[in-house]
Every structure is written in C-alpha cells, then in structure tokens.
Amino acid sequence: MALLASIYALRIAGLFLILPVFALFAGELAGHTPLLIGLALGAYGLTQALLQIPFGWLSDHYGRKPVIAGGLLLFALGSVIAATASHIGIMILGRAVQGAGAIAAAIMATVADLTREEQRAKAMAAVGMTIGGTFVLSLVVGPLLHGLIGVPGIFWLTGALAIVAIGALYRFLPTPVRVAAGRRDLRRDFGRILRNRQLLALDAGIFVLHLVMTAMFVVLPLIIVRELGLAGADHWAIYLPVMLVGFLAMVPFLVLANRRHRHRAVMAGAIAVLALAQLLLVFGQQSLYGLVIGLTLFFAAFSLLEAQLPSLVSRLAPAANKGAAIGVYSSAQFLGAFAGGTLGGLLHGVAGFDAVFWMAAGMLVLWLVLVLTLPEPQLLASHQINVGNQSPGQAARLAERLSRVPGVAEAVVVAEEGMAYLKIDARVLDKKHLEQFGSSV
C-alpha cells in the first residue's frame, strides 16, 4: 500500500504544494485578476471532476494499472505547461491538463482490491491520512521550495516525479483482480450509485470540504503577508506548528469513530469545528493568535474528515462498483476544489477577504444539517467466495441463490473469474449455509 499511497500523495501534492504560495505568484502573471487567480487554482479540480467517473469506470472494466499510468502522463504534461506559463490563461490551461489525469478513484479502488476486509478500513484510512500528511508537508515544503526554485520549479519537480511513479507502478505493484464484469453498462453502474442516499451525502460532504479548503487559500497567503508581514517563503513557520498539532489532535477521534461505531457523531463534531474555525479567521485574522488557533482547528477537523470519508464510501459501495462509487466521490471532491477556487476568487475581488470565510461557514452549516438528518450509516462487510467455473447463466442463478442466504445483502458472481463478491452483515450471517457455495477467499 505504500506505493499507492505515494502515488496518491504525488497527485495531491500537485494541488497542495502550490496552495500556500500560488496566490502570491499568480499576481505576477500577465492578465491576472482575483477571479482568474482563483480559477487557475481550482481549474485542476474541474477536469478531475469531469473525468473521475469515466476513469473509475474504466478501471473497473479494463484494469487499474493502465488507467493510473495514463493519468500520471497527463499530470506530467500539465505540469510542463504550467511551469512554462507567463500568462494567467496558459496557467489555467496547464492546471486543467494536470487535473485531467483523474486517477484518485482508480487508486482507492486498487487499495480496496488488494486488501482483505478486516484490513480494508485501516488501509483506506491510511490512504486518506496520506492526504492529511501530504497537506502537512505541502504547506511547509511549498513555501520553502518557492524560495529555492519558485513555483515553476515546483511544477517541473512534480512532473518529473510523475514519470518516475509510472515506472514504480509497473515494477512493484501487484496486478489486482478485476471485480467488475465487462458486460455491465455505464448507466446501470452509476444509476445504482446515484440512488444511494448515504453515498450521496458523503459526496456532498467531500464537495463542501474541498470547496472550503480551496477558497481559504485564495486569500490566506495574502492575509498572512498583509497582517503578519511574512514573505511567502516564510509561511511555513505558521503552517508547521498548527498542522502538526491539528494532525495529532484528530487521531483519537478517528479511533473513536471506528471502534465505537460513532461515525455520524464524530463527523458532525468535525464539521462544527470547521465552521468555528471560519469565524475565528473572520474575527481574529489581524492577530497571530487568532490565525494560529483558527488554522489549528481547521487542519485538525480537515485531516479527520479526509481519513474518515473514503473509508465510509468503500464500505457503503455496492460490491462490484467500488471504482464507480469512489469515482463519484472523487468527482465531488475535485469539483469542490474548482468551486472553491472560483467562488473564493470572485468573492475576494468583489467583497474582500471576510466574505470568503463567511461563505465557507455557511456551506459548512448546511453540511452539518445534512449529516444530522441522516441515520448512523449501516456498514456492511465485503466477502469473496471462490465458486469455480461458471457459465453466465449459472452465475446469474448462483447470485440469486446467494442473495437469499441470511445476512447476505448483495451478491455478484463474475463468471469468467469464478468468484462471488458479497456484501454481508456479519452479525446475522449464516456462515454454514454460505460455505456450501464455495471456499472463502
């Protein structure tokens, strides 16, 4: 899982490394306005959002590795365009091409494919925490790299690392078994996902989370320069302590959610903390203490939700549509980044810094209300059975019989693989009955 986490971190770093310095750098590009700066920051998210679902579906049907490698190539190309941009329009193009390599869904689905159910929640949380860890490093390393090689140098660096990652992908990563059958159609796959209310609530949540985060960083670097007088290369001195404290503070709450099955309560608490952080940034931005406390609360809650949400999506997703479900989730995540950059830039240009934080607080309150109206998620376990060679007709009949076993909520039999993929409620599962159909994997 370390390699997948590293590739995911590289892709996320393409967004996060420039977050703390991009607003400062983009002000030097020809043709810039606050709105276009925000659009350039969020353009990465728009193409990610448009292509996550197709890439997730393709990874279900044609394999994870080719999709991941193709996405890394697009990311490298976009990095070259952004590195050589002298006009804000070219920068927007480069960021859009970077985002076209929409591999987050394929990576998360591969993690699910390569881990057993009893370890899957931990693996998903670990990859989710990689985002938080990348966030920590990016906000510290980004300003330092800005001082050493500039923002263009950061783009060159991440593009080169993407090429290295392709070689590592084929050299070291096992090829996962493809779960989805090639005969299923796109409309049916995504119809099942889009009718699931709990999955849609998680999609809405990750949209708001990344909208808020990206909008904040349209104005936050400018506030630090204006109010604290810190040059861009020195912003790491603010981010390092608050990120470390925030990251460590979230761990006990993540453990509580998983061990005590208090997912909704922990999520609601984290959202409330995010909203409080926005208010502190409105009223306390003129002082070092106000900024530090607000940012610490924000990063603690952000890291917690980034670790919690993808694990919930994987466990709630239909058995044979993990790539599709995570594709919808990832699309919402990156669409939020695009919306946040665009709205942040627009509000900054029209109404100033405070308007951005008030907008973010309002969005978070709406998310909190949504979470409080939903029941505690009913998380099912995944289970695989080796059922031997099956014709398509036999596979369909076997899936129907398996679905009637007490405790089996869903059954998908892939004839060409000789495998049955189940969603089960372990508390009521009739294990002896299930063993009659084949050996568990």
Where are these regions (language model features)?
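Conserved MFS/SLC helix-loop-helix module at the cytosolic interface between two early adjacent transmembrane helices
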Residues: L50-S86
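Cytoplasmic helix-loop-helix junction between adjacent transmembrane helices
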Residues: G94-I131
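Helix-loop-helix hairpin linking two adjacent transmembrane segments in secondary transporters
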Residues: V127-Y170, F353-D354
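Juxtamembrane intracellular "pre-TM" segments in multi-pass secondary transporters
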Residues: L173-G205
